């Protein structure tokens, strides 16, 4: 789920401004630890030329924008639980100190990466305490003690054959939305009713896989920190550390195939996280594939498809009138020139204006209709994120008995943190070209892009377009492949058409009929069908050879 409220709020500043060419501005150093939003304020005085004009235009039309950019929210209140309350504590420094002898007779570290600052706390969750599922469960925190970061996770074993079934890491997007949303709203073992009871989900993805739900980056959901993470690359190192320590504690899961799946802004996260894992030759993470659902990964290719989706060319009736559709067409050239500048420099000074302008001018007309940006068939209900169920989930997870059962240490749970969303936006992360990492991953493993076809915000047209435009050695074969019917093959609905699939080698695209931004919510049977078959390797270079 993507949170667009902040970008749309400030977007009018430059959408209403005169046409300008965006020039490359000072490049921020991603290795600098200084908070990125403060860096923008400090460096603003040094901008020159048209870049200055662009930011002056923002400030002129939204006078308090620099206060918004530099606002630092207070850290979450928390109560650190004593070590005696945890069943296991895994010390990264101890793991990093382990050396083994390789086949060549040379000694090397058992696992790579900088782990000395990390610990993993593990709590065995009593299944009877909450009744979410009867399977074995673990929850806890990855602690980065050096940087005061604490990431919360919740693990569920497979309902089927946990000794042999694969392990899946699930990531929601935002940026800044809790993966416990995915757990209780989409693909987890239970949903939450209006009276805050758990309701068994027969289509949970842990039907045939063990699943880890991770609240990341810090200050999302039950996670917390005195600082912040504001770009995808920094978050990737935390995820690698968590998985490494988790599989060290539970080697029985480390031997299984491992997959990363997620939706929305996870289209940014997953290519980075998978690349971070594969960058370590010595690892205990058996990564076999990645899955991105209704993701944002290649904005330059995806943004031109917002107008067709909103204006009746995506398989559903038009949401916008002709004048609004024309305004999107008129704004697109400037939007694309800004994204191109962002792709060229990958600097906040070009990527931030692109995000603000394009989100207002290209996405804003739809957002202002009051329709659900995650499902073109419905109106928006229940606040900015449009789903009343999110309120029920938050109430459930804010109960003291739930927090105690899981070992949660924060005082409050929120489904989405808009401060995180703002931080990523003003770091320039939103528009960056993370699709450039995908060719390297396709060379190593199967990659799936799936898209519910009723979603507007990360619509199937845009995802299909960037899949077909991606330059990699198998591009020609994938581009030439036909879209074929995707049908249910192994249950009482056998033969039912649930979408279309296009696959060549290790790259696959799926369109899921009747699914919105969150396919497992709208089409639970279809989502479990394709997930089970994907985990069995049905669409891969090996299966097609």
UniProtKB/Swiss-Prot annotation:
GO CC, alphabetical: fungal-type vacuole
Keyword terms of this UniProt record: Carboxypeptidase, Disulfide bond, Glycoprotein, Hydrolase, Protease, Signal, Vacuole, Zymogen
Leader sequence segment: 1-17
Keyword Nucleotide-binding found: no
Active-site residues per Swiss-Prot or TrEMBL entry: 264, 455, 517
GO molecular function: serine-type carboxypeptidase activity
Main location: other
GO biological process entries: proteolysis
Nucleotide-binding in keyword set: no
Record localization: Vacuole
EC class: hydrolase
Pfam families xrefs: Peptidase_S10
Function noted in UniProt: Vacuolar carboxypeptidase involved in degradation of small peptides. Digests preferentially peptides containing an aliphatic or hydrophobic residue in P1' position, as well as methionine, leucine or phenylalanine in P1 position of ester substrate.
Matching PANTHER family: SERINE CARBOXYPEPTIDASE CTSA-4.1 (PTHR11802:SF113), SERINE PROTEASE FAMILY S10 SERINE CARBOXYPEPTIDASE (PTHR11802)
Protein name (database record): Carboxypeptidase Y homolog A
């Amino acid at each position: 789920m993507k949170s667009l409220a902040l970008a749309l709020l400030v977007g009018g500043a430059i959408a209403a401004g005169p046409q300008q060419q965006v020039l490359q501005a000072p490049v921020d150093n991603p290795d600098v630890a200084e908070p990125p939003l403060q860096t923008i304020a400090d460096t603003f005085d040094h901008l020159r030329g048209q870049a200055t004009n662009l930011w002056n235009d923002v400030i002129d039309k939204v006078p308090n924008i620099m206060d918004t950019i530099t606002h630092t929210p207070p850290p979450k209140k928390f109560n650190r639980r004593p070590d005696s309350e945890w069943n296991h504590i895994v010390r990264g420094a101890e793991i990093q100190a382990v050396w083994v002898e390789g086949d060549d007779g040379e000694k090397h570290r058992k696992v790579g990466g900088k782990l000395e600052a990390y610990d993993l706390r593990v709590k065995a969750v009593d299944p009877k305490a909450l009744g979410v599922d009867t399977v074995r469960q673990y929850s806890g925190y990855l602690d980065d003690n050096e940087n005061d970061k604490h990431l919360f996770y919740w693990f569920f074993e497979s309902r089927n054959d946990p000794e042999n079934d694969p392990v899946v890491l699930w990531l929601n997007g935002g940026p800044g939305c809790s993966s416990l949303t995915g757990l209780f709203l989409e693909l987890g073992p239970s949903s939450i009713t209006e009276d805050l009871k758990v309701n068994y989900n027969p289509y949970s993805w842990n039907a045939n896989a063990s699943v880890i739900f991770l609240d990341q980056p810090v200050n999302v959901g039950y996670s917390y920190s005195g600082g912040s993470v504001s770009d995808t690359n920094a978050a990737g190192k935390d995820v690698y550390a968590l998985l490494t320590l988790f599989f060290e504690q539970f080697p029985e899961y480390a031997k299984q195939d491992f997959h990363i799946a997620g939706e929305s802004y996870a289209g940014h996260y997953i290519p980075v996280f998978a690349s971070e894992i594969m960058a370590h030759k010595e690892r205990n993470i058996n990564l076999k594939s990645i899955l991105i659902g209704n993701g944002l990964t290649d904005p330059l290719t995806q943004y031109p498809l917002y107008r067709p989706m909103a204006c009746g060319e995506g398989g559903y009736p038009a949401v916008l009138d002709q004048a609004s559709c024309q305004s999107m067409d008129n704004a697109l050239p400037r939007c694309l020139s800004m994204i191109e500048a962002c792709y060229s420099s990958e600097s906040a000074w070009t990527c931030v204006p692109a995000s603000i302008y394009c989100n207002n001018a290209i996405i804003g007309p739809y957002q202002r209709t009051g329709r659900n940006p995650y499902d073109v068939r419905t109106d928006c209900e229940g606040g900015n994120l449009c789903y009343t169920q999110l309120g029920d989930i938050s109430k459930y997870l804010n109960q003291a008995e739930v927090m105690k059962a899981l070992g949660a240490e924060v005082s409050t749970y929120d489904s989405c943190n808009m401060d995180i969303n703002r931080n990523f936006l003003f770091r320039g992360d939103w528009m960056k070209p993370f699709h450039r990492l995908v060719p390297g991953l396709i060379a190593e493993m199967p990659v799936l892009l799936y898209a519910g076809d009723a979603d507007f915000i990360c619509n199937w047209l845009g995802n299909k377009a960037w899949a077909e435009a991606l330059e990699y050695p198998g591009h020609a074969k994938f581009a030439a492949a036909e879209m074929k019917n995707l049908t249910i093959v192994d249950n009482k609905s056998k033969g039912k058409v649930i979408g279309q699939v296009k696959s060549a080698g290790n790259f696959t695209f799926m369109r899921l009929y009747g699914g919105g931004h969150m396919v497992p919510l709208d089409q639970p049977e279809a989502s479990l069908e394709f997930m089970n078959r994907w985990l069995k390797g049905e669409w891969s270079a090996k299966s097609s050879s």
